A protein has these predicted regions:
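Predominantly late transmembrane helices and immediately cytosolic-facing juxtamembrane segments
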Residues: 14, 18, 83-119, 170-199
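Alpha-helical transmembrane segments of multi-pass inner-membrane proteins
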Residues: 5, 9, 85-86, 165, ...
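Membrane-helix interface motif
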Residues: 59-72, 141-156
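Divalent metal-coordination and catalytic microenvironments
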Residues: 10, 36, 65, 102, ...
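Membrane-interface segments at the starts/ends of alpha-helical transmembrane spans
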Residues: 75-80, 156-167
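Interfacial and helix-entry/exit segments of alpha-helical transmembrane bundles
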Residues: 26-63, 73, 79-91, 115-140, ...
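Alpha-helical multi-pass transmembrane bundles of energy-transducing inner-membrane proteins
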Residues: 1-34
Length: 224
């Protein structure tokens, strides 16, 4: 039931992320995050709703992802403390890479060349209204939906409750991950991540060579 609960809440904030990505691509005529940056002042609605989705998927209360993710983590800790910690660390990694995405698009340094060719702009209401609608659902659906009254496969009522210790641990891990992403990617000049990549260039190149882009990009181009 925890998995089904998370599947439901995940549908809301993940749809919000995908629609937000569509608005961003529509605004800048590019899907390369490396060409973006500083878009928050051009796209305030997309910016705020995208931030809400990132907070939800990171598991920050009171957004819906917090409630459903915590049910999964509680079940994992009940099964095995080792499994619980593994899943908690993975959840922290999710918070980190989502805020890397958020800062890379809406903060950081503006791409002056891209903006000179095409000034970014907020999407029309036909595109931003679904964002606002999904953002509102993302905020409230975690604590107003009656998932605690659902029944399990054997007919017993499913007991949904927050484990205070698990919840506190997951929040601390998520906040640390978000702060780390903020430190590395939110700067408007040279992000800390770029400085670390330059300092450890050999390790950075080795890690980059392991990325799937070297497989996926030639395959995509061959299929076009």
């Amino acid at each position: 039931m925890a998995g089904m609960f998370h599947l439901f809440t995940h549908a809301m904030f993940k749809a919000l992320l995908f629609l937000g990505a569509g608005c961003i691509i529509h605004a800048v005529h590019s899907n390369e995050m490396s060409t973006m940056g500083g878009l928050r002042k051009y796209m305030p609605i997309t910016h705020i709703t995208f931030l809400i989705a990132c907070l939800a998927i990171a598991g920050i209360p009171p957004f819906s992802g917090f409630f459903s993710k915590d049910e999964i983590l509680t079940a994992c800790f009940q099964f095995s403390p080792v499994m619980g910690w593994i899943m908690t660390i993975i959840a922290g990694m999710t918070a980190f890479y989502m805020f890397r995405l958020y800062y890379g698009i809406f903060w950081g340094t503006e791409n002056k060349e891209l903006h000179a060719a095409h000034t970014p702009h907020e999407s029309p209401l036909t595109m931003t209204f679904p964002l606002m609608f999904l953002a509102a659902i993302t905020i409230v659906c975690g604590w107003i939906l009656p998932f605690g009254h659902f029944v399990s496969a054997n007919g017993e009522a499913y007991d949904i409750h927050l484990n205070a210790q698990v919840a506190a641990t997951s929040i601390i891990v998520a906040v640390i991950a978000i702060l780390l992403a903020t430190w590395m990617y939110a700067r408007e000049k040279q992000p800390v991540a770029d400085m670390l990549a330059a300092r450890f260039s050999t390790l950075h190149r080795a890690a980059y060579k392991l990325s799937l882009i070297h497989i996926s990009e030639p395959t995509r181009l061959a299929l076009i």
